[in-house]
Amino acid sequence: MDHKPLLQERPPAYNLEAGQGDYACGPHGYGAIPTAPPPPPYPYLVTGIPTSHPRVYNIHSRAVTRYPANSIVVVGGCPVCRVGVLEYCFTCLGIFLAIVLFPFGFLCCFALRKRRCPNCGAVFT
């Protein structure tokens, strides 16, 4: 059974002009972006006589500071030799207080730490 669609069942044509069909806007121009007004006419200049002063351009220069590209800052690096990385070490007094005042002595032990460079041996408090 070949069933051909009737004329009423076919979809509408795609070549509808503006203002036709189901999705047409209301009155013409409603919702459209208004066009810009034409630019004002330019005044006529008389040739041969300069009408304006010559233009002067000001050029400002800025001082640019350049930093060396090979300076690498290591966090925790030794400020004396700039090679070693500082390590924490506990003082003898801090270890003694940690043993004698057992639970609370650890606070004293961590409060009395020093930073030491393994490369040059410098000690920082």
UniProtKB/Swiss-Prot annotation:
Family of this protein: Belongs to the BRI3 family.
Assembly and binders: Interacts with BRI3BP. Interacts with MGAT1 and IFITM3.
Pfam families: BRI3
Superkingdom in the source lineage: Eukaryota
Keyword Ribonucleoprotein appears in the UniProt entry: no
Role: Participates in tumor necrosis factor-alpha (TNF)-induced cell death. May be a target of Wnt/beta-catenin signaling in the liver.
Name of the protein: Membrane protein BRI3
Keywords: Cytoplasm, Lysosome, Membrane, Transmembrane, Transmembrane helix
InterPro entries found in the cross-reference section: BRI3 (IPR019317)
Lipid bilayer topology: Multi-pass membrane protein
GO CC annotation, single: perinuclear region of cytoplasm
Ranges that cross the membrane: 71-91, 92-112
The encoding gene: Bri3
Gene Ontology molecular function terms on file: identical protein binding
Subcellular location: Lysosome membrane; Cytoplasm, Perinuclear region
